[in-house]
Amino acid sequence: MALLPDKEKLLRNFLRCANWEEKYLYIIELGQRLTELRDEDRSPQNSIQGCQSQVWIVMRQNAHGIIELQGDSDAAIVKGLIAVVFILYDQMTPQDIVSFDVRPWFEKMALTQHLTPSRSQGLEAMIRAIRAKAAALS
């Protein structure tokens, strides 16, 4: 995730955007920075149900117990939202992910009130899936 900013820089960059068009473009740019997902990882077990777009999220635990996330979507804005979620969960253990509430970060960014209801539901589905996978590993 070296190409993605940390949580604090994400928030600073997001708040520097002059309007929501710039914020959407920034989210899309973050999605473009994600590591390419391998074709074999675009499988049903990595598919996230509850998203209008196709979304795949792969979770692996490294030798130090830290979760590594990879993901992709067929929609640019959704891929950017995946990147935002990954930034928030960066360098966490499964236990950290289960106990960490991303919603205050979304509130600071005023993110959810500017998403369509289906995108908000998809974002919630991604978070639920990541937390469930983390709970299974903890």
Curated annotation (Swiss-Prot):
Keyword Cytoplasm part of the UniProt annotation? yes
Tell me the domain of life: Bacteria
* Complex formation: Homodimer. Interacts with SufS.
Pathway annotation:
Cofactor biosynthesis; iron-sulfur cluster biosynthesis
Q: Where in the cell is it found?
A: Cytoplasm
The entry's function note states: Participates in cysteine desulfuration mediated by SufS. Cysteine desulfuration mobilizes sulfur from L-cysteine to yield L-alanine and constitutes an essential step in sulfur metabolism for biosynthesis of a variety of sulfur-containing biomolecules. Functions as a sulfur acceptor for SufS, by mediating the direct transfer of the sulfur atom from the S-sulfanylcysteine of SufS, an intermediate product of cysteine desulfuration process.
The family database entries (InterPro entries) matched by this protein are listed as: Cysteine_desulfuration_SufE, Fe-S_metab-assoc_dom
Keyword entries, A-Z:
Cytoplasm
Gene Ontology process terms (BP)? iron-sulfur cluster assembly; sulfur compound metabolic process
Q: Cite the PANTHER family for this sequence.
A: CYSTEINE DESULFURATION PROTEIN SUFE (PTHR43597:SF3), SULFUR ACCEPTOR PROTEIN CSDE (PTHR43597)
- Protein family (similarity comment): Belongs to the SufE family.
Primary location recorded for the protein, binned into one broad class: cytoplasm
The organism encoding this protein is: Shigella sonnei (strain Ss046)
UniProt KW Cytoplasm keyword: yes
List the active-site residues. Answer: C51
What name does the UniProt record give this protein?
A: Cysteine desulfuration protein SufE
- A GO-annotated cellular component: cytoplasm
